[in-house]
Regions:
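Carbohydrate-interacting regions of secretory-pathway proteins
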Residues: 60-61, 70, 88-95
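Structural detector for short beta-strands of small beta-barrel domains
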Residues: 9-40, 80
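OB-fold (S1/OB) nucleic-acid-binding surfaces
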Residues: 32-57
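Cys/His-clustered metal-coordination modules, chiefly Zn-binding fingers
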Residues: 90-140
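Short nucleic-acid-contacting surface segments enriched for D/E, G, S/T with interspersed K/R
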Residues: 60-78
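Short, charged beta-turn/beta-strand-edge "cap" motif at the junction between a beta-strand
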Residues: 81-87
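Boundary at the C-terminal end of the N-terminal hydrophobic targeting segment
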Residues: 2-10
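Extracytoplasmic
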Residues: 15, 41, 71-75, 104, ...
Length: 140
């Protein structure tokens, strides 16, 4: 029986680097593959540093890249979970990679002091939240 998401072990995880893009736009740029207009922004994918396109499961962590275009402009390292027989990956953690270093990304509510994984109103107070960028230990 395949492992459920909450049962996945470290052997099912990987670290991938690149930029998150819309799959249809990347297929057009990299390979000249044209999709229908309505597919243009349907699927998010990680375009790796060597131009592989890896689809992203759009749960709350994946959806963050749709809701906040700042994330799609960043070079990122994604800690992902892979499932046997599935080409898409599920995001576990997000890191920004810059010349200054590696930074873990999430969203933060200063009022409630809670972290969230996508740009939206705070789950608790319904107030605004901010993109939080914290230096990350090099635990790779």
């Amino acid at each position: 029986m395949p492992a459920r998401a909450d049962e996945a072990s470290d052997r099912n995880s990987a670290r991938l680097t690149g930029r998150v893009v819309y799959l249809a736009e990347a297929l057009q740029k990299l390979h000249g593959v044209k999709t229908v207009d309505e597919a243009r922004q349907n699927t998010l994918a990680l375009q790796t540093d060597d131009d592989q396109l890896i689809p992203i499961v759009e749960d709350v962590r994946g959806r963050a890249f749709r809701r906040d275009d700042r994330l799609r402009k960043m070079r990122v390292e994604l800690l992902v979970r892979r499932y046997e027989g599935v080409p898409a990956v599920q995001i576990i953690r997000v890191f920004e990679l810059t010349d200054e270093g590696r930074f873990e990304l999430d969203y933060w509510c200063d009022i409630c002091a809670i972290a969230m994984f996508e740009l939206k109103a705070c789950d608790c107070c319904q107030g605004p939240i901010e993109l939080r960028r914290r230096p990350a230990a090099d635990d790779r």
